[in-house]
A protein has these predicted regions:
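Internal gly/pro-rich beta-alpha loop/helix module
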Residues: 86-171
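Accessory alpha-helical/coil subdomains and C-terminal extensions
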Residues: 1-15, 133-202
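ATP/NTP phosphate-donor binding region
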Residues: 1-48
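Conserved beta-strand scaffold positions in the cores of enzyme catalytic domains, especially
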Residues: 21-25, 83, 125, 199-201
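Structural motif
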Residues: 54-55
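Short helix-terminating capping/connector loops at secondary-structure junctions
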Residues: 15-18, 79, 116-120
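Predominant activation on well-ordered alpha-helical scaffold segments within soluble catalytic domains
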Residues: 4, 40-43, 47, 69, ...
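Short Gly/Thr/Asp-enriched flexible loops that form oxyanion-binding sites at enzyme active sites
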Residues: 58-81
Length: 202
């Protein structure tokens, strides 16, 4: 609702009345406070609404957007529809916000290449001009609109006047979707292992 208020032309830029949009609020908190419980609730909301929509878009704060992209990638088992996660560097309603642009880009990717059936599938991040696998989202800057990049692999595609998808990278992304993993554990730690590390510490 806030995006439409600040940018009434958003839907007309992405298909207008041909696109039906419904909103579900899973939580409203600073993304720095996102936890595995929220990931479970978000994944559950996606599953509950999965059959009713052609694509699902998640709006998320940037601090932990990459973590949520990875969590959803492993929590959702072999999704055949696009689950697109995006956010903004500048909040909606402030001057020079990129919120409307990123949502427009997310919709364009979700319906790519146009027509009745999207060829995009699985969890992807859309931010600035980059389309990134959900497992590869890394925030690299707090200042530029292209805030996220794909680490250890290239982006699936780029967005400009057209949505340009690398078909080989998209095919590889789709082949990586099936996981069937359990919900994420709620007690986690990141341990950096060095020579002579005592395993009893873990």
């Amino acid at each position: 609702a806030s995006v439409k208020r600040h940018n009434p032309g958003l839907l007309s830029n992405t298909g207008g009345s041909r696109i039906r949009v419904e909103l579900r609020e899973v939580c409203n908190l600073d993304s720095s406070n996102i936890s595995p419980i929220v990931w479970e609730n978000l994944a559950g909301t996606i599953r509950d609404n999965y059959d009713d929509f052609d694509a699902l878009i998640v709006l998320h704060g940037t601090n932990t957007l990459g973590y949520t992209g990875a969590a959803l990638s492993f929590a959702l088992v072999n999704p055949t529809k696009p689950v697109v996660i995006t956010g903004s560097q500048v909040p909606s309603g402030l001057p020079a916000t990129d919120a409307a642009m990123n949502i427009e880009h997310a919709v364009r990717v979700a319906v790519w290449p146009g027509g009745d059936i999207s060829r995009m599938a699985g969890v992807v991040g859309v931010f600035g001009s980059h389309i990134i696998p959900g497992t590869r989202l890394k925030k690299t800057t707090s200042f530029d609109y292209d805030a996220f990049r794909s680490f250890s692999s290239e982006s699936i595609g780029r967005i400009g006047r057209l949505v340009n998808i690398d078909e080989d990278k998209l095919s590889k992304h789709k082949s990586y979707l099936h996981t069937g993993l359990n919900p994420p554990a709620r007690r986690q730690a990141d341990l950096r292992v060095e020579p002579e590390f005592d395993a009893r510490i873990a």
